[in-house]
Amino acid sequence: MTSLTGKVAWVTGAGTGIGEAAALAIADAGATIVLTGRRPGPLENVARRMNEAGIAHVQPADLTKADEVRDVGKYIRASFNRLDILVNNAGVNIVERHWDKLTPESIDTLLEGNLTGALYCVTVALPFMREQKDGLLIHTASMAGRFIGGLSGPIYTVAKHGIVAMSHGLNMQECVHGIRSTVFLPGEVATPILDKRPNPVGPEARARMVQPADCGDLIRYIACMPKHLVMNEVHLSPSHNRGYLAALERQI
């Protein structure tokens, strides 16, 4: 495995789930990690798991607030004066996902939490990477970012399609600065966001899903790829296809 020693990575949504797993995996490859999320407690827990090497730095922020995102950027500038990797992972969903239940407030929550915050993070990361003529952006979208379905809800789907478009647009414009962008589209992953599903997901079903550590390993692999390559888009799903099997049962 290629070493990431000397690299600085900023991981958002780092307190749980995919973000936590990505932070641990990239740290294991030697990178210094800046952990960001809304809640300091989970971030501190993640930091304690990697801080024997002194490589974790906790910077809580509400990524829907541009000034708080800029403050994290200022911390990175003052502490390291470089940023090599952004894992743009923070995201949210809600229980009431159907059009007849949506409100202006819930629409704002979904768009700001899944798309606006990610855009803010990119605008903070790019100046570092342009200066360095090198940098990698990895964005967690969802299968909902490429395919239309009823499970994730329409506004979440809109936001994740935006993440996909953002990443491909970054590769078009920023390649001249040595910057690469990957959009990661996982299927069902056993993370706390499942608790927001309208119908509860039991432990047996969760055990068959993609696990956060699987995502962390993939993100580390992307982070260690040679600079002359870019993985534009990558899908990862469980081999147990719950959607197909549920449809089959309904047909029977």
Language model feature labels by segment:
Residues 176, 183-184, 203-245, 249:
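C-terminal helical subdomain
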Residues 122, 159:
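Active-site helix of classical SDR
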Residues 31-45:
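Conserved glycine-rich Rossmann-like NAD(P)H-binding loop of the short-chain dehydrogenase/reductase
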Residues 41, 60-71, 104:
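The beta1-alpha1 cofactor-binding region of Rossmann-like NAD(H)/NADP(H)-dependent oxidoreductases
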